Design a protein with these regions (language model features):
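Short, charged helix-capping/linker segments at alpha-helix termini
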Residues: 17-18, 33-42, 52-71, 186
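Structural recognition of an alpha-helix C-terminal capping motif at a helix-to-coil junction
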Residues: 53, 67-74, 87-99
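Acidic, proline/glycine-rich intrinsically disordered inter-domain spacer in sigma factors
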Residues: 13-19, 23, 123-152, 224-228
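Arg/Lys-rich amphipathic alpha helix in sigma70-family domain 2
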Residues: 78-85, 95-116, 195, 204-206
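Short amphipathic alpha-helical boundary/capping segments
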Residues: 27-31, 149-158, 203
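Helix-turn-helix DNA-binding module
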Residues: 151-188
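C-terminal edge and immediately downstream basic/flexible tail or linker adjoining helix-turn-helix-like DNA-binding
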Residues: 2-11, 112-119, 149-152, 166, ...
Length: 233
């Protein structure tokens, strides 16, 4: 017997037979709204690592990143009833995380080594980790070394461009979703991502020493070219 979406999401004695790993994020949060704790546990399993990595790239403090990750997940649970499927669940989650980071940075604004998400001068730069590496390093270079090289390149991107860049290249959010997370105009989102890509290219090219780095650069350039062509159509 197959369960309908409404039967499963809103509760059924047969729901235990369904693997939560096969359920969409948006359906899981509806299950959380209906008091199903295991659905929340599945969302935590999916997002805790991503949130920690994303926040750590901004605050550069593992302890603080862990604290803000936990706070984000707590707010997801406590305010689950506020979610409506007018946006992807991931967009909602990263909006919560970004707002928490923004508030924390306001509180700690006198500490110059922490990234503030408030509007900043054009040349204000802060170090941030690079996009995730999906391929194993080759030609004798370790993953940690490769990550350090890409982190150095990403650190050359001013923070006002870096945040949209990471949301696009790391978290794979659409331009419209980044607009929702950051509160920027759509044209500004596109412009800042393009500028960030240019900064990344300029910074990474002198560091190219192996095929993995070259492949990462080519991936970003190909994606940028594809989006440019779409804009012209």
């Amino acid at each position: 017997m197959n369960l309908s979406r409404d039967e499963f999401v809103h509760g059924s004695p047969l729901q235990a037979r369904v693997d939560l790993r096969e359920i969409r994020d948006e359906d899981l949060i509806v299950m959380v709204q209906n008091g199903q704790r295991k659905a929340f546990d599945e969302l935590v399993a999916r997002y805790k690592g991503r949130l920690f990595s994303f926040i750590l790239r901004m605050v550069k403090d593992p302890t603080l990143a862990e604290e803000l990750t936990q706070e984000t997940l707590i707010r997801v649970y406590l305010h689950a009833d506020k979610y409506r499927e007018i946006a992807r669940f991931s967009t909602w989650v990263f909006t919560i995380a970004t707002n928490l980071v923004r508030n924390k940075m306001r509180q700690r604004s006198r500490r110059p080594l922490l990234l503030s998400l408030n509007p900043a001068p054009e040349d204000d730069e802060m170090p941030l980790d690079p996009p995730d590496l999906r391929q194993d390093p080759t030609e004798g270079i370790h993953r940690e070394e490769l990550a350090a090289i890409m982190a150095a390149a990403t650190a050359k991107i001013p923070e006002k461009y870096r945040v949209p860049f990471l949301l696009r290249e790391v978290e794979q959010l659409s331009y419209e979703e980044i607009q929702q997370v950051t509160g920027l105009k759509l044209g500004t989102v596109r412009s800042r991502i393009n500028r960030a890509r240019n900064r990344f290219r300029q910074a990474i090219k002198p560091m190219l020493r192996n095929e993995t780095l070259l492949a990462e650069l080519e991936r970003i350039e190909a994606r940028a070219a594809e989006e440019d062509n779409e804009d012209k159509d």
